[in-house]
Amino acid sequence: MEVLAAETISQQERLQAIAEKRRRQAEVENRRRQLEDDRRQLQHLKSKALRERWLLEGTPSSASEGDEDMRKQMQEDEQKARLLEESIARLEKEIEELENADTLPAPVKETQVAPSPGPVVPAPCPAQEDRKAEVDLNAQQTPVGTPKEKRISNTPMRMVEGSTMMNAAMYSVEITVEKDKVTGETRVLSSATVLPREHPPQGIKVYEDETKVVHAVDGTAENGIHPLSSSEVDELIHKADEVTLSEAGSAAAPETRGPSEEVVRTTPSRREITGVQAQPGEATSGPPGIQPGQEPPVTMIFMGYQNVEDEAETQKVLGLQDTITAELVVIEDAAEPKEPAPPNGSAAEPLATEGSREENQVGPEAPASDPQDLDMKKQRCKCCSIM
C-alpha cells in the first residue's frame, strides 16, 4: 500500500511539473509576441523621428507653429521610444529567466519505504519520471513555435536534441541588403548560394530557430544591429528569392542569343548573289530545314469572297477609280511626206520611226496614190491607252 501511495504521489508531482512547464511555455510565448510588437513599434518610431528631423533641418531658421508642433511630436516619440526600449529589455530578461528555469533540474525527493516481507518493488525516481514526462510532452504536446533547442552554437553545425551528435547545415545564402534610413525599408541588392563553411564569418547572430541561423556580417557598427523576428527573416528570404529569379532571367537572355551570333560569324557564304546585301542573322532567322538558296515559304490566309457586278465598284476594289483613259489616233495622208511628232514626243516616236522605215522600204515599189498603200497606212494607225 505504501508503494502505491508513493507511486500516486510521484505521479501527482509529475503532473504538477508538466502543468508548470506548460504555464512557463505559455508565458514565454506571450512575452515573445509582446517583444516582437514592441520592437516593431520602436523601429517605426525611430524611422518617423529620423524623417521629421530631416524635414526640420531643411526648413528655414524662422520658427513657425507647424515647426513647434513637429518638435513637440518628436519629443513625445522619443519618450515613447525610451519606454519601449525599457520594456524590450525587461521582456528579454524575463524570457531568459523563464528559459533558465526550464533547464534547472527538478529537486530529487527521497521516498522512504518500510520493509515488508514480500518482494519490494523499487520506486521510480521522481526526477527521472519528470524528465521522461517532459520529453514525452515535448514530443507530443509542444505548441507550434515553441523553441525546443536551447543550446546556441556559433557554427553552421547544430546539436540534435537528446544527443551529442551535430547536424551540419545543408546550404548557406549570402544576402546583401541596403536599408533606407528615411523610410526604414530594407532592400535586397544581391543574393548568392554558397557552400556551408565550418567556421562562419565574424558577425553578430540576429536570429536562430530550428532550421535557420542568421548572422549580420558587415555594416554592424554603422547601421546598428537588432535581433530579427521570424516574419522579418521570412520576408528577407522572399525578397532574396525574387532577386535571384530576376538575375537568372536576365542572364538567360544573352546566353540564348550567343550561339546564333557565333554561327553567323563562323559560317562562310557559299553563294554570291549580285545586287543583294546579306544581313546578319539571315542564315538562322528562317525555319529549320531551309537552305540558304531557297526562298522561305509564304503563309496565305483566306479572307473570303467578294462579288462585284458594277464596273465602278470593280474599279474601286482594284484601285483604278481615279485613273484617266486617253486615246491617241494618228491618221496619215499621202500628200504629207512626214508624220507630225506628238506634243510630248515620247509615246509615238518609235511608231513614227518604224513607219518611215517601212515607207523607205515600200516606197520605190508602189506609187503613193495606190489604194492598197492607203489601206496599209490606215492599218498602221495605233491607239494607246494611258492609265
Swiss-Prot record:
Chain intervals with Pro residues compositional bias: 116-125
Top-level taxon in the UniProt lineage: Eukaryota
Phosphoserine: residues bearing it: 116, 163, 246, 346, 369
Compartments where found: Cell membrane; Cell projection, Filopodium membrane; Cell projection, Axon; Cell projection, Dendrite
Its membrane topology: Lipid-anchor
Propeptide feature: residues: 385-387
Primary location: membrane
Region (Disordered): 22-78, 98-133, 246-297, 334-378
Post-translational modification Cysteine methyl ester, affected residues: 384
Start-end of Basic and acidic residues biased regions: 25-41, 69-78, 258-273
Cellular component annotations (GO), alphabetically ordered: apicolateral plasma membrane; axon; basolateral plasma membrane; dendritic spine; filopodium; filopodium membrane; neuron spine; postsynapse
An example Gene Ontology biological process: adenylate cyclase-inhibiting G protein-coupled receptor signaling pathway
Lipid attachment, kind S-farnesyl cysteine: 384
Family annotation (InterPro entries): Paralemmin
Task of the protein: Involved in plasma membrane dynamics and cell process formation. Necessary for axonal and dendritic filopodia induction, for dendritic spine maturation and synapse formation in a palmitoylation-dependent manner.
Protein name per its UniProtKB record: Paralemmin-1
Species annotation: Sus scrofa
